[in-house]
C-alpha cells in the first residue's frame, strides 16, 4: 500500500520554509499531496489558481527528483476531512518553534480522534528558515523590500510583479 501524505497550508505565498518541509516530506512518502486551504472569509494575496501554479512550479520538481508522486489540490472543509478524501495516512506539519508545537499538538489530538488512521508527522524547520512566515514575506514585499532570501526565485518574481506600481 503506498504511503500518501497530505501537506496542508495556505501557501500565500510559498516560502523557503514550505520548501524545507517539502524536501523532507518527499522522503517520508510515496505520494505527496499539497493541499491549499480555501476559506471564504479570507482574502489571500494570490488567487487560488496562482497558488496552485506556484505550488506545482516550486514543489513538483523536488518531488520528481526524489521519485515521489506529487499532486496539488484545494479544499474548503476540515483539513482532516481533506486528508481522508485524498486517501492520506500521513499529515505533514512544519514546526518553527514551541508556539507552533503547542498549537499543532492540539490539532493533531483532535484529528487523531476524528481520523485515527491519519498520523500527524511534525517536521521541525531548519535553522535557516525558522523565522520565515508568509505573513512577514507579504508585508516586506508590500513595502518594497527584498524577499529573495525568504522565497524561491520564481515566487520573488511573482511578488515583485504583484506589488509593482
UniProtKB/Swiss-Prot annotation:
One of its GO terms (biological process) is coenzyme A biosynthetic process. Substrate binds at residues 10, 42, 79, 93. Pathway: Cofactor biosynthesis; coenzyme A biosynthesis; CoA from (R)-pantothenate: step 4/5. SUPFAM superfamilies: Nucleotidylyl transferase. The record marks 18 as: Transition state stabilizer. The keyword Lyase does not apply. The keyword Nuclease does not apply. It catalyses: (R)-4'-phosphopantetheine + ATP + H(+) = 3'-dephospho-CoA + diphosphate. Its EC number is 2.7.7.3. Its cofactor is Mg(2+). It is found in: Cytoplasm. ATP binds at residues 10-11, 18, 94-96, 104, 129-135. One of its GO terms (cellular component) is cytoplasm. It holds the Pfam family CTP_transf_like. Keywords: ATP-binding, Coenzyme A biosynthesis, Cytoplasm, Magnesium, Nucleotide-binding, Nucleotidyltransferase, Transferase. GO terms for molecular function: ATP binding; pantetheine-phosphate adenylyltransferase activity. Homohexamer. Reversibly transfers an adenylyl group from ATP to 4'-phosphopantetheine, yielding dephospho-CoA (dPCoA) and pyrophosphate. PANTHER family: PHOSPHOPANTETHEINE ADENYLYLTRANSFERASE (PTHR21342:SF1). Belongs to the bacterial CoaD family. HAMAP family: PPAT_bact. This is Phosphopantetheine adenylyltransferase. It comes from Rhodopseudomonas palustris (strain BisA53). The gene is coaD.
Amino acid at each position: 500500500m503506498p504511503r500518501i501524505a497530505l501537506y496542508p497550508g495556505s501557501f500565500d505565498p510559498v516560502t523557503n520554509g514550505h520548501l524545507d518541509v517539502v524536501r523532507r516530506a518527499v522522503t517520508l512518502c510515496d505520494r505527496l499531496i499539497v493541499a491549499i486551504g480555501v476559506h471564504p472569509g479570507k482574502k489571500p494575496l494570490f488567487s487560488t489558481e496562482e497558488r496552485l501554479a506556484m505550488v506545482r512550479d516550486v514543489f513538483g520538481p523536488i518531488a520528481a527528483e526524489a521519485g515521489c508522486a506529487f499532486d496539488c489540490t484545494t479544499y474548503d472543509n476540515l483539513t482532516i476531512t481533506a486528508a481522508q478524501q485524498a486517501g492520506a495516512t500521513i499529515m505533514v506539519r512544519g514546526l518553527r518553534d514551541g508556539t507552533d508545537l503547542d498549537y499543532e499538538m492540539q490539532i493533531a489530538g483532535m484529528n487523531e480522534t476524528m481520523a485515527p488512521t491519519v498520523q500527524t508527522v511534525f517536521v521541525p524547520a531548519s535553522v535557516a528558515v525558522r523565522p520565515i512566515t508568509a505573513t512577514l514575506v507579504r508585508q516586506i514585499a508590500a513595502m518594497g523590500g527584498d524577499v529573495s532570501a525568504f522565497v524561491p526565485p520564481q515566487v520573488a518574481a511573482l511578488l515583485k510583479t504583484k506589488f509593482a506600481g
